[in-house]
């Protein structure tokens, strides 16, 4: 093993175990509390009488959707993981990209017999950051839904509000007490969590993250259209997922747009600021000669030679030529 491509570090394993894994566990735990418990109560939002935007037909449970949530969540989690895993192994096997990878990444020596290969480091880093961002996106979405309590387009059909005692004869009358529903409480609670769209956020986060990975790491010399087609296909799938939510009256258009902005923002932040555009953390640029700038002036201006100086120099050159040619030849045969 080349000594110039290794780096000894005894802190990387403890930092990974006691810092990064703890942060990851806390993120997963917070996402679990948002998803599976009622620890965080939903804001009860009022509504207008017979609001046309809330009178859309009930599309049925989420499991009856054209894009079922369980399948969507499995795809947005498994597809990027598989692409990153296969991509890193393929680049490591190929000679040209493998040498470039070794030039960017150093093998970490953590003990007398323990080494962290650059391939393992990159796979753990890219997939780990992706998983963290996926749970973070879920937390942001759930927090927004709990805080706003925005109503779904089908809210009034499942709420079945009890208008008894309320003078609700005009559609412009606002009912501040939004807790007058007589319908199924589980369905009503789900209808209060519309903003932002979770499916749109998770799908666009996954698509943008993988698109950044493909465009930044995978190099193809034989085909110019393979990467664009793959990346645009992923982005199109995420876009169609959001449109499906609107077409089935499960989310408002603004909910889907907010989900797109949230998911893409998190993916861009992690891809650019955290994993450095999927480049190596220990790049080895060519060493250049260090120049000593001490003693030089703070500012220098280009020297412009005047015409008089040019003519004077030419005159001196001509005189020297004439003197040389006028001297007799002192060499004899």
Swiss-Prot record:
Coiled coil: none annotated. It is a multi-pass membrane protein. Gene3D superfamilies: Phosphatidic acid phosphatase type 2/haloperoxidase. Glycans are attached at residue 162. The chain crosses the membrane at residues 12-32, 66-86, 126-146, 200-217, 223-243, 256-276. One of its GO terms (molecular function) is phosphatidate phosphatase activity. Keywords: Cell membrane, Cell projection, Glycoprotein, Membrane, Transmembrane, Transmembrane helix. One of its GO terms (cellular component) is neuron projection. Belongs to the PA-phosphatase related phosphoesterase family. This is Phospholipid phosphatase-related protein type 1. It comes from Danio rerio. The lineage of its organism: Eukaryota, Metazoa, Chordata, Craniata, Vertebrata.
């Amino acid at each position: 093993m080349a000594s110039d491509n290794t780096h000894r570090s005894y802190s990387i394993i403890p930092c990974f175990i006691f810092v990064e894994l703890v942060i990851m566990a806390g993120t997963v735990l917070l996402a679990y509390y948002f998803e599976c418990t009622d620890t965080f109560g939903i804001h009860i939002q009022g509504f207008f009488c017979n609001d046309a935007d809330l009178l859309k037909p009930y599309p049925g449970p989420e499991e009856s959707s054209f894009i079922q949530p369980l399948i969507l969540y499995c795809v947005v989690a498994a597809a990027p993981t598989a692409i990153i895993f296969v991509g890193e192994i393929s680049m490591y096997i190929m000679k040209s990209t493998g040498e470039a990878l070794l030039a960017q990444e150093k093998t970490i020596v953590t003990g007398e017999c323990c080494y962290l290969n650059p391939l393992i480091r990159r796979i753990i880093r890219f997939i780990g950051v992706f998983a963290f961002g996926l749970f973070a996106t879920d937390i942001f979405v759930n927090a927004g839904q709990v805080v706003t309590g925005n109503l779904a387009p089908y809210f009034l059909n499942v709420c079945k509000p009890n208008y008894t005692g309320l003078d609700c004869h005009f559609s412009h009358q606002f009912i501040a007490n939004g807790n007058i529903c007589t319908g199924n409480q589980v369905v009503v609670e789900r209808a209060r969590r519309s903003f932002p769209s979770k499916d749109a956020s998770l799908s666009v986060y996954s698509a943008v993250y993988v698109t950044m990975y493909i465009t930044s790491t995978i190099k193809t010399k034989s085909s110019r259209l393979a990467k664009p087609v793959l990346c645009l296909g992923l982005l199109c799938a995420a876009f169609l997922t959001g449109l499906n939510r609107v077409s089935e009256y499960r989310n408002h258009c603004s909910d889907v747009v907010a989900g797109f902005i949230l998911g893409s923002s998190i993916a861009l932040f992690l891809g650019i600021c955290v994993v450095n555009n999927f480049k190596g953390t220990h790049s080895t640029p060519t060493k250049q000669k260090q120049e000593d700038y001490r003693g030089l002036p703070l500012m220098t201006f280009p020297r412009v030679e005047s015409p008089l100086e040019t003519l004077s120099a030419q005159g001196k050159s001509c005189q020297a030529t004439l003197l040389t040619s006028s001297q007799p030849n002192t060499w004899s045969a």
